[in-house]
């Protein structure tokens, strides 16, 4: 049975205790994970603070920090098979996805390596002839990066990459539900040659790990991806120290299909939007809003396509669809699906727990047309359940798309260019995908509105999240200050 360790102040160590990690494909224990408790969390933060001020890190130029990130990116690529296999075993995500996602992880680190020496200040043209002023951007300090189990390597890269590029130090908390990929990633941090304490990797449970980390007075910035309820706890914990908080939370993203679109493209994109990663994605397009005139044809073809999705063991490259991560998640999904059917939703496909080992749940489509209170329409399930509703006008599509407190992502399929522009203006979401879905790039900011959080990841915007500004004034005159009591 595999064993993993924490990484604190440049050294690997056992946790205060151990806990089991379950393989979602089999339901069996496959590894022992280290549990960090209060003392180890405190030591990780102390190490990060000490490293932040130590010349071995603070004395590096921006381009030198970039070189370390370039090396890390190369190591991620070199270790891709191992990292992908661990993520597949620990989370149940299919190897086809974890393998391809590792390439994105390397690209994000490479992008921020190149950006490190391009985080610039600016000259301020003040209206005072005897004064000059300029703006300096400085790293904010110790960053607590808290990520969920799904896509841990990717979701940590979009935090750790810009934080290190900006000159911050990091305590990275891996989800206790599947921490193996990030605990393995710590070995790459060590091999890349980052000074001790610059990046620390821990895992553990909420009360003695996450809560201690988010309330720590030495943490200057908390970057969190996860659910709104946990986010509220983090914000409350951080309030005592007024730490900066950036949140990338969940969503109930609308996937809007107009009758004038290319149906084949929309079908494939909808499959990707909700059934890729078994629906366990913050941007899952879990609400299909379909123009009424094409509903029957679209649903028939979608149901036929869903039946051909190959479910199987996640480590098989032929598998298209794997298990859910936890038994608890499967039980929640089944309860919501059953309740929605009781409320009047029509089951098109799926809806029953799969027989056999592992936490499998079939691709499920619920026709919720005319059942506006169906629970599946309003609940972020984090699973493979598509709720279908119709619209007859553009205004109705917009109203239904925005009828949620979330606002992370949306998809719009139409061949009408002016309509596409109108929809992007009207929809309240941080990302709008037009005639595509689930596309990312290191250059493009990512984030949401409302209960989907605030702050942005990706692009220059993300690096600036980890900086603070300092305004510097210089008096140019040789003349003495004549009146000290007058504001200049």
Curated annotation (Swiss-Prot):
GO molecular function annotations of the record: oxidoreductase activity, acting on the aldehyde or oxo group of donors, NAD or NADP as acceptor
SUPFAM superfamilies linked: ALDH-like (SSF53720)
UniProt-annotated binding residues for NAD(+): 149-150, 226-227, 249, 380
Keyword Oxidoreductase: yes
Keywords for this protein: NAD, Oxidoreductase
PROSITE patterns according to UniProt: ALDEHYDE_DEHYDR_CYS (PS00070), ALDEHYDE_DEHYDR_GLU (PS00687)
Active-site residues per Swiss-Prot or TrEMBL entry: 248, 282
Superkingdom to which the source organism belongs: Bacteria
The EC number(s) this enzyme carries: 1.2.1.-
InterPro entries reported in the protein's UniProt record: Ald_DH/histidinol_DH, Ald_DH_C, Ald_DH_CS_CYS, Ald_DH_CS_GLU, Ald_DH_N, Aldehyde_DH_dom
Reaction(s) catalysed (UniProt annotation): (Z)-2-((N-methylformamido)methylene)-5-hydroxybutanolactone + NAD(+) + H2O = (E)-2-((N-methylformamido) methylene)succinate + NADH + 3 H(+)
Keyword match Coiled coil: no
Family designation: Belongs to the aldehyde dehydrogenase family.
Subunit structure: Homodimer.
Stated role: Involved in the degradation of the pyridine ring of trigonelline (TG; N-methylnicotinate) into succinate and methylamine as carbon and nitrogen sources, respectively. Catalyzes the NAD(+)-dependent oxidation of (Z)-2-((N-methylformamido)methylene)-5-hydroxybutyrolactone (MFMB) to yield (E)-2-((N-methylformamido)methylene)succinate (MFMS).
PANTHER family: ALDEHYDE DEHYDROGENASE-RELATED (PTHR11699)
Name of the featured protein: (Z)-2-((N-methylformamido)methylene)-5-hydroxybutyrolactone dehydrogenase
Species in which this protein is naturally found: Acinetobacter baylyi (strain ATCC 33305 / BD413 / ADP1)
Taxonomic classification: Bacteria, Pseudomonadati, Pseudomonadota, Gammaproteobacteria, Moraxellales
